[in-house]
């Protein structure tokens, strides 16, 4: 049975003090839950190396929230996947809806980043999802196909071997309105079946997470669905006790 991936995306939040407290608490509680779960933390870039030093010894994995499309060069203010790897990052979030909406990242840019991550033997967490307008127009599957096709066109049929997908309906991100777990199950099954057309091995081993207003109150309803393989958690992951509750819930389904 595949392990569930429970990932904390802290976005632009945290301080040295709050992160130190969070990690001290987590390290004291987490050991019994690591057998059946893969736990990932994606802090702001400035805290990556500090977090790595705290979590590496207990087998919690480090993720970056974003990278540039370039590995080196005169690109002031950007962060390289190569540099991320050098400081212990294993996973990199690609194409989060906030990057798409606030930084105008399109499928082409996201595909370039995906390829960089794969070529460095890191693991991309590819975020895909539809807007509320697209959902109401019954275009969800069409949009997801377009987002997935951009990856296949750039990297080939085996693109999703050693990769993670996070389905995050854009209308649910940061709104407090989570999607219906049964509908999410259908979409996750669609994603896996679509990838299976290109590569059976990818589809059979693929982890597809759900992200969008996840809390300890609704996490179980998502995780009990057969094709929801984990969670990408935003605001709820900033609260140490809430995050641990979600991990415990995940562990109870294995």
Curated annotation (Swiss-Prot):
Q: Where is the active site?
A: 96, 168
**InterPro entries from the UniProt entry:** Aldolase_TIM, TIM_sf, TrioseP_Isoase_bac/euk, Triosephosphate_isomerase, Triosephosphate_isomerase_AS
* Reaction catalysed by this enzyme: D-glyceraldehyde 3-phosphate = dihydroxyacetone phosphate
- CC terms in the record's Gene Ontology section: cytosol
Could you say which EC number(s) this protein's record lists? 5.3.1.1
Q: Which HAMAP family match?
A: TIM_B (MF_00147_B)
Q: What is this protein called?
A: Triosephosphate isomerase
**Native organism:** Buchnera aphidicola subsp. Schizaphis graminum (strain Sg)
């Amino acid at each position: 049975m595949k392990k569930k991936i429970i990932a904390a995306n802290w976005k632009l939040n945290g301080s040295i003090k709050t992160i130190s407290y969070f990690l001290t608490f987590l390290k004291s509680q987490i050991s019994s839950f690591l057998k059946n779960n893969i736990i990932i933390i994606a802090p702001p870039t400035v805290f990556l190396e500090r977090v790595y030093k705290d979590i590496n010894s207990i087998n919690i994995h480090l993720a970056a929230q974003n990278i540039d499309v370039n590995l080196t060069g005169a690109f002031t203010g950007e962060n390289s996947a190569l540099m991320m790897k050098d400081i212990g990052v294993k996973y990199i979030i690609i194409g989060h809806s906030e990057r798409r909406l606030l930084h105008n990242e399109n499928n082409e840019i996201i595909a370039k980043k995906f390829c960089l991550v794969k070529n460095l033997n890191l693991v991309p967490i590819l975020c895909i999802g539809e807007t509320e307008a697209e959902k109401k127009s019954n275009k969800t599957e069409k949009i997801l196909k377009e987002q997935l096709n951009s990856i296949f066109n750039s990297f080939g049929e085996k693109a999703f071997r050693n990769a993670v997908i996070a389905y995050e309906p854009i209308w649910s991100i940061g709104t407090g309105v989570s999607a219906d777990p049964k509908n999410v199950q259908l979409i996750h099954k669609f994603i896996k079946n679509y990838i299976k057309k290109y590569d059976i091995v990818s589809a059979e081993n693929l982890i597809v997470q759900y992200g969008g207003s996840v809390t300890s109150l609704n996490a179980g309803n998502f995780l009990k669905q057969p094709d929801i393989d984990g969670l990408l958690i935003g605001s709820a992951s900033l609260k140490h006790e809430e995050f641990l509750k979600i991990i415990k819930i995940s562990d109870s389904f294995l």
